[in-house]
Amino acid sequence: DVAVHLDHGLTLETVKKALELGFTSVMLDASRDPFEENIKKTKEVVKLAAEYGATVEAELGLVGGSEDGKSDHGIQCTNPQDARIFCEQTDVDALAVAIGNAHGDYPVAPTLEFGVLEEIRDITGKPLVLHGGS
């Protein structure tokens, strides 16, 4: 099997188009939205993806760095309790978290908070995704 994943989709319309094209996994990146809005949008994506038999990744917390020509070095670690609530309310298949990781090039090596990662793993039971790991 081959998985085709939409990473960092910015609108529900983009996610829907990807699903219509046969993507097997999608991500609506609502991580910059307020917590409740992220939950609301992600729930919509989970419901839509289920109609296509696709999996859903969501992002919680802010992963800084530079990607697609945009630069933002503001990293906010994912709060483990927020991750628990988010996963319970959305039923996402995988959760991208921020533990000090950053997209793209960074002038100083990031400090990863592995304790936070372990706590999120233990409290959610979901597969976790780390963006900016290379």
Where are these regions (language model features)?
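Short acidic/histidine-rich active-site segments
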Residues: 132-134
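Alpha/beta enzyme core
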Residues: 3, 8-127
